[in-house]
């Protein structure tokens, strides 16, 4: 149950709900993935946000959404990589379970995606940062690959 809790995180996905509302999926620092209804225009993806959350059910009520930094827009491979990150967070992260290492790695990965276009070996760099994120997520979920031993 959340009573006027402030959440810090990122908008992962949203879809229209009724005339002036959206169902949104957030990846928050405090509670991991949180789903809710937002009665205002959602923030762009990949932007750090702060939002007020209330509610007892799995679908919270979000109010007072605030974008914390200037918008970041990805192009080309960085756009598709960001979309991929959001999809695996949405599909793999359990509802309302904090994943602090994964959240930190998500932030690091977004920063690295901003630098992708200026990187000398962009394709190799992209694969590396995506694998680092996947490894952090799987490790925190308890499905990490043990590279120390072989079968």
Report the location of each language-model feature.
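Non-catalytic alpha-helical scaffolds and adjoining flexible linkers that form interface surfaces
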Residues: 1-22, 27-151
């Amino acid at each position: 149950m959340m009573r006027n809790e402030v959440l810090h995180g990122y908008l992962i996905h949203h879809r229209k709900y009724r005339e002036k509302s959206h169902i949104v999926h957030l990846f928050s620092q405090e509670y991991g993935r949180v789903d809710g209804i937002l009665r205002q225009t959602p923030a762009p993806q990949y932007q750090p946000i702060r939002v007020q959350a209330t509610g007892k059910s799995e679908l919270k009520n979000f109010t007072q959404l605030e974008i914390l930094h200037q918008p970041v827009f990805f192009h080309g491979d960085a756009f598709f990589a960001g979309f991929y990150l959001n999809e695996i967070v949405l599909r793999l992260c359990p509802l309302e379970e904090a994943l602090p290492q994964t959240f930190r790695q998500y932030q690091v990965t977004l920063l690295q995606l901003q630098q992708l276009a200026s990187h000398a070996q962009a394709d190799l760099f992209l694969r590396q940062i995506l694998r680092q994120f996947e490894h952090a997520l799987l490790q925190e979920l308890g499905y990490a690959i043990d590279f120390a031993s072989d079968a």
